[in-house]
């Protein structure tokens, strides 16, 4: 059962914490953003790539200390299908590092998350 794996990982690491991944492009270090923008231009693909690279670095730093991550779907959806792909790749990467993943996809959430959901479905993408 899934929660048995989580409990086992908590016991192994002696840590019941979960790291939330609520990425916004402005949270990503500038050097990572710059590398993605050079590679893909100022596009949603570049934004999603920068977030993925940052997530991988976070996961690498945390996987031996924190048993689980909780990516918030709204923050990935803000970057179109490329962001949703980044969510899937983040999940796979965390799992490959032995982390338990709890995707937070509830639609009735706090203000910041509701803003992220609203941003995910704009007339045009202006948040790059």
PLM regions with names:
Residues 126-127:
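Conserved small/polar residues in nucleotide/adenosyl-binding loops
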Residues 108-122:
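Glycine/small-residue-rich loop that forms an oxyanion/phosphate-binding "nest" at active or ligand-binding sites
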Residues 22-26, 74-76, 106-110:
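Active-site beta-loop-alpha junctions enriched in small/polar residues
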Residues 1-61:
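N-terminal glycine-rich anion-binding loop in soluble enzyme alpha/beta folds
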Residues 13-17, 65-67, 97-99:
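Short, well-ordered coil/turn segments that N-cap beta-strands
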Residues 17-21, 69-71, 101-103:
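Hydrophobic faces of well-ordered beta-strands that scaffold small-molecule active sites
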Residues 84-101:
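Alpha-helix-loop-beta-strand connector modules within alpha/beta enzyme cores
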Residues 72-82:
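Glycine-rich, proline-tolerant flexible connector loops at the mouths of alpha/beta enzymes
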